[in-house]
Amino acid sequence: MRTYENKDELKNEINKVKIIFFDIDGTLLEMGKTEITPNTRKALCSLKQNGIKICIATGRPFVTIPMFEGVVFDAILAFNGSFCVAGEQVVAKCPIPKEDVKKIIENAKRMERPVSIATAEEIVANGSDKDLEDYFALAHHRVNVSEKFEEYVEKDVFQIMLGCDLEERKYILEGTKNAKLAAWWDRAVDIIPKEGGKGTAIEQVLAHYKFSKEEAIAFGDGENDIDMLLSVGKGIAMGNAAEKVKEIAADICESVTDDGIYYYLKSQKLINE
């Protein structure tokens, strides 16, 4: 974890903050929950009042991203950053190459694993299993098995999701050229474009707003948040974060169940008392 030699160095860095990126599951929201805590809501609203932009950076597709009453995010980075919007403007759009989509589906079939694919507007699957069902249940959604699955394969696919254990991860990308794993759960994976990721998307959002890396901070907990935390001036790991995330973080706050974001922002004078 990065350390600061004195309080003035930390204070100067915090005073630069103009934009903050938040993961959802395990960061803004406790796993399996649908609503943020009152303190988290208070923190987000206070940041907006103080002129700091707030953004979601999540592995979730757009249609599964929850809206929180009274909170308006300035930008949303969905599909682990493969599709980003700032207000009504598309800032980044990076689908998985068609040949890789088809190869991954072929690999999954050989592994006897159903897959779910996400376009900008829809999520459809060619089947379901316990791991995929439980994965979707974390976001309080159901797997949508569609007879029109093959039609959606021909559209822009921004993310592929499937149940997949650690051993199976070695094989799911065989034969692909421009796809990579973005995993944050041990029983399933997200697959995104190789040039995608939350970190790449954050760079594009910062360019859109004409902010520097040093003017941004981010909060995350999963391994798919690592590049995000390294793409900002100060990446903060949640207390409940994976050890790999804590190792690269500039700082660590309390866990999501203990209102870690609220108390951290309060301690850094980024939100009002």
Report the location of each language-model feature.
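Conserved acidic, metal-coordinating active-site core of Asp-based
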Residues: 107, 111-231, 240
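Short, structured coil segments at secondary-structure junctions
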Residues: 71-72, 80, 175-178, 231-232, ...
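Short hydrophobic/aromatic-enriched beta-strand-loop microsegments
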Residues: 73-81, 94, 137, 181-184, ...
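Active-site phosphate-binding/coordination module
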Residues: 31, 38-131
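Short, hinge-like loop/turn segments at secondary-structure boundaries
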Residues: 71-75, 94-95, 131-136, 200, ...
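Non-catalytic pre-domain segments flanking phosphatase-related domains
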Residues: 1-22, 49
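Mg2+-dependent phosphoryl-transfer enzymes with acidic/Ser/Thr/Gly-rich catalytic loops
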Residues: 10, 14-19, 191-273
